[in-house]
Structure formats: C-alpha cells, structure tokens
C-alpha cells in the first residue's frame, strides 16, 4: 500500500489539482488508479489513550506543505498537529512550523452534527469557533494552503472517521 500511495501522490493530475485548489477527494473519485488507494492511518497509544494520526500534503505560497493531524479516540477532537514546508517565506508562511500556530489546533473539532467541517483559518485574530484557528499574519496564502490541505485529506478519511469503534 505504501508504494501505491507514493505513486498516486506523484500523479501529475493530482499535483495539478492540489495546485489549482481542487478537492483531493474529487480527484481521487475521478481517477481509477487513485480510487483504490488506501490512505495510511497511524495509531498511537499516548498515556493509555488511542490517537489516530493522519498524514496530509498540500501547497503553500511557494511550494509543498505537509504535516500530520492527530485525533483523539473520538475521531473528532484534534489532539495535535505538525506541519512543515519546503520553501515558505521565513517569518511569514514558514511560521506554520512554529508552536504558536500549531498549538491552537489542539482541542478543535472536525465534525458538527455528524457533518465534516474540518478547520478554517481566520484572519485578524477572529478565530473563536470550535472549527477555527488564527491565520499567520502576513502568511495568509500559506495559512489557507494548510486549511485546504487539512480539509482535502479529512474528506479522504471521512468514511474512516465516521466509523464507530
């Protein structure tokens, strides 16, 4: 499965869809080679609590961004995130790697009344909702890239996330 996923992620149509901001899940449904891909789910036991860790890939302002979103056993509450990038601007979009940005995802939820809401970034320090975090000042495009990346990948995992344990 790992090789199949790596091959699928190198698909030029998928790469273009990510750059164009198209939903990854739509691209996967339309591409027979991608439709059969099983996306990895890592399971961790942290202090006796199960955490589900999902990899994510996307596009920032200047290139690829990627990361992991970890969910509590309820598959709704974010335990934590980790993001990185290839070439975002230092002091701006590159701040996605900093604790001040990543910590604000903890405790956020991705569902509302059984509907996947993912997490949105808000400009100007106005993030107050259960599904919102503050964007990086001066790094709006990269912040929006992280939002899109998380949303696209959570859609790919939606069936798994809705499964009851």
Feature roles, as predicted:
Residues 1-165:
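Flexible, solvent-exposed loop/hinge segments and secondary-structure transition points
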């Amino acid at each position: 499965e790992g090789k199949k996923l790596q091959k699928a992620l190198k698909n030029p149509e998928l790469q273009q869809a990510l750059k164009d901001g198209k939903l990854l899940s739509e691209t996967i449904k339309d591409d027979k080679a991608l439709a059969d891909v099983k996306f990895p789910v890592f399971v961790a036991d942290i202090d006796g609590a199960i955490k589900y860790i999902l990899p994510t890939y996307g596009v920032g302002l200047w290139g690829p961004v990627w990361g992991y979103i970890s969910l509590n056993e309820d598959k709704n509450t974010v335990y934590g995130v980790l993001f990185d990038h290839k070439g975002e601007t230092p002091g701006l979009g590159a701040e996605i790697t900093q604790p001040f940005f990543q910590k604000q995802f903890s405790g956020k939820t991705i569902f509302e009344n059984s509907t996947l809401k993912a997490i949105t970034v808000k400009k100007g320090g106005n993030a107050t909702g259960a599904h919102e975090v503050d964007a990086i000042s001066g790094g709006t495009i990269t912040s929006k890239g992280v939002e899109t990346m998380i949303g696209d990948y959570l859609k790919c995992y939606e069936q798994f996330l809705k499964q009851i344990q």
